[in-house]
């Protein structure tokens, strides 16, 4: 009796990581199917530009890789879902004075939810991506573990996994360094082996989110006042969507000293300006929580926490609140804690969970 190969659908962006992920899984004996999520909108600038995972060139790169690996390739239409679950909330968050992370929302709602359900609907056992993270089962629970390549670790953007999603997801790149992934791609003759990493927001071609929001919702972007913490007017801003906490460049203010964005008030349409010391805080409130290592936080625990993708984990205590949110208290002050960003909790290399920063205390 022959054993049936397990089927895996690999989400392919046209980049080197997902391409090598497909190769590694085929080598491990899986029946591999390549698929690219078509998420670009009716926007020729985005559709035709080079590089990003939304572009037509990325689809062609993924198709060529699948031809090389001799695996089937499909393009799946996620346009409506991407607009509803990623783009529209992204715009609204900025209008509401927060700074969102669209990659986290895309992972949560599309890649590891809708794509997984579509895959299971056609009899596929697993989905896989080129993310730098590891999934391991310990006792009766799946764990999300930091990548072996600390510089490229992507667990910050992956904390929303459910146990069922982890059970049906493969991330083969987590066992390798980025340099080794590129070497493998070159060794097997993949043209994407030296393709540049995509670092900008995939649906914004010039990385100018303010201009993007102005074009999408012109009536929602209004100029207002820069004020100090006492409410004194220091100048005019061009719309709160252009600013984020801790920002110094591009303010267009001349006040004789270095100043930074310390708060954004959508109710009054004001951007609060202050000294650098004003953007260092130790406490925050987070909501929209997801925990991986347990179902619910019952008591306060000590963790390491990251407040943005590029931050180093810092020692903190998370305290459950009666309303279902948590208070996070850092041992040391953190620079530019920002509403709308995620705070992610770690125990060493293990991801405990995370949530959205809703308030800074």
From Swiss-Prot:
Disulfide bonds join 106-202. Pfam families: tRNA_Me_trans, tRNA_Me_trans_C, tRNA_Me_trans_M. It catalyses: S-sulfanyl-L-cysteinyl-[protein] + uridine(34) in tRNA + AH2 + ATP = 2-thiouridine(34) in tRNA + L-cysteinyl-[protein] + A + AMP + diphosphate + H(+). The record marks 131, 341 as: Interaction with tRNA. Gene3D superfamilies: Adenine nucleotide alpha hydrolases-like domains, HUPs, Translation factors. It is found in: Cytoplasm. NCBIfam families: PRK00143.1, trmU. Belongs to the MnmA/TRMU family. This is tRNA-specific 2-thiouridylase MnmA. It comes from Clostridium botulinum (strain Alaska E43 / Type E3).
